[in-house]
């Protein structure tokens, strides 16, 4: 049986918490496992890891292969270095001294690791968390933009209706103005014709 050290999700929706487990690599990610050896809290600042180091070393010595994220956790805690030195035959004292020195170096570089967010060395879970936050922000922006678009469309429709109403009123007013002017012109023509008839002289018989 091929054993893998990997993460198994146990957290609530949008609040992920992971068990660090030894499991048959043929099983589903969140399925059956052989042993639970720790917890990983990626959303805490900084991310928190609780790990039974002796059990992690036991599984490494028995050929278990860590996933990328678990490998990163083990490396930062000096367990991969411990396993490597033990395979080389170093004494327990030398191993402990080397691991302690490595952990001090990692602690000094802690701020540099935080600043390097977004680089190739970023943990897969960190990338997943940032991607989830980006999706949530995009959804919120879309939700805010939709009502504004609806209001804008309604306003434009009302403005178009007002323009049509104003044009119709102008047309009616122009029509009413033309009718009195036409009647006045007709009356003027009638008066002029009557004056012309009065001014005609009678013909001699």
Swiss-Prot record:
<dbReference type="InterPro" id="IPR023803">
    <property type="entry name" value="Ribosomal_bS16_dom_sf"/>
</dbReference>
<dbReference type="InterPro" id="IPR000307">
    <property type="entry name" value="Ribosomal_bS16"/>
</dbReference>
<feature type="compositionally biased region" description="Basic and acidic residues">
    <location>
        <begin position="123"/>
        <end position="132"/>
    </location>
</feature>
<protein>
    <recommendedName>
        <fullName>Small ribosomal subunit protein bS16</fullName>
    </recommendedName>
</protein>
<dbReference type="GO" id="GO:0015935">
    <property type="term" value="C:small ribosomal subunit"/>
</dbReference>
<dbReference type="GO" id="GO:0005737">
    <property type="term" value="C:cytoplasm"/>
</dbReference>
<dbReference type="GO" id="GO:0003735">
    <property type="term" value="F:structural constituent of ribosome"/>
</dbReference>
<keyword id="KW-0687">Ribonucleoprotein</keyword>
<dbReference type="Pfam" id="PF00886">
    <property type="entry name" value="Ribosomal_S16"/>
</dbReference>
<feature type="compositionally biased region" description="Acidic residues">
    <location>
        <begin position="153"/>
        <end position="205"/>
    </location>
</feature>
<feature type="region of interest" description="Disordered">
    <location>
        <begin position="110"/>
        <end position="205"/>
    </location>
</feature>
<dbReference type="GO" id="GO:0006412">
    <property type="term" value="P:translation"/>
</dbReference>
<comment type="similarity">
    <text>Belongs to the bacterial ribosomal protein bS16 family.</text>
</comment>
<keyword id="KW-0689">Ribosomal protein</keyword>
